[in-house]
Each structure stands twice: as structure tokens, then as C-alpha cells.
């Protein structure tokens, strides 16, 4: 298992770093949990979709199965933007054949004890919930 995440990273940053990581590690499975920071910065859902799709395709071309962990934004970003953002993850999964967890924080988001003070990042208490969300989609890829 290689954790190549960088705190605060966007899909553009992940895409820029992906090729050398694929070359170095030759993963069998790639889990992409990117996009939240794109959304929190108000970046274009169109660009998010393009970047995420490119990351999935590059990973698949390198021989990896891909799991996308979808995200959602707080409602203060407006209905139109949050809807467009949330639609990116299932669209990319459908277009690329990647596996999908629609919302990785399902059951934890909005629960104060399961989220850090920023309301964005999960706590240690939330990890069993995240496992329940991710494992059914991840297990078939292993």
C-alpha cells in the first residue's frame, strides 16, 4: 500500500504527480480520493471531471483497477455548484468503468464526533464507518 496523498491537493496536482507514481509502484489497484479541495476552492466541475477521468485512464492504461471515492460539498456553495460537483464522480466512473463509492463520508459527514473541527475531515471515530462504505467496492478489486 502506497499513500501518495498530499494534504490540500487538487486533481490537477494529483494528475501532475501520477505518472511517476504509476511507473515506480506499478499498482494493481488505485484508489482516487481527490476532488474535495477542487470543490472547496470553487474550481470548475468540468476541469475536475477532466482531471479525474485522465487519472483513471492513466491508471487503467498502467494495468491498475481503479476505485473512485466520491465526495460532496457543504450546501453553502449553492445548489447548482454542489449538484454539478457531486455528479462528476458517478459520471467519471460510468464513462471509464471505474468502481465507485458515491460518497465516502456517508454516515459520518454532519456527525460532530466523526468530523474534525473543520467539518471536512473525518476523525478516528469515523474510520469504521468509512471502512463500511469502501470495503464492498474495494474487495472485488483485490
Q: How would you label these PLM feature ranges?
A:
Residues 1-10:
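A short beta-strand-loop structural module common to alpha/beta enzyme folds
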Residues 13-142:
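Alpha-helical cap/lid subdomain in secreted, periplasmic
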Amino acid at each position: 500500500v502506497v499513500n501518495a496523498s498530499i494534504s490540500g491537493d487538487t486533481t490537477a496536482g494529483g494528475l501532475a504527480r501520477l505518472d511517476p507514481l504509476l511507473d515506480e509502484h506499478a499498482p494493481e489497484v488505485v484508489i482516487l480520493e481527490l476532488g474535495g479541495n477542487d470543490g472547496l476552492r470553487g474550481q470548475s466541475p468540468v476541469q475536475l471531471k477532466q482531471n479525474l477521468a485522465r487519472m483513471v485512464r492513466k491508471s487503467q492504461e498502467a494495468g491498475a483497477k481503479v476505485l473512485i471515492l466520491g465526495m460532496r460539498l457543504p450546501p453553502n456553495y449553492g445548489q447548482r455548484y454542489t449538484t454539478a460537483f457531486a455528479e462528476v464522480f458517478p459520471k467519471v466512473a460510468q464513462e471509464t468503468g471505474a468502481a465507485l463509492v458515491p460518497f465516502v463520508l456517508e454516515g459520518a459527514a454532519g456527525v460532530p464526533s466523526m468530523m474534525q473541527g473543520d467539518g471536512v475531515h473525518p476523525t478516528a471515530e469515523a474510520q469504521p464507518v468509512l471502512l463500511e462504505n469502501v470495503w464492498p467496492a474495494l474487495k472485488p478489486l483485490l
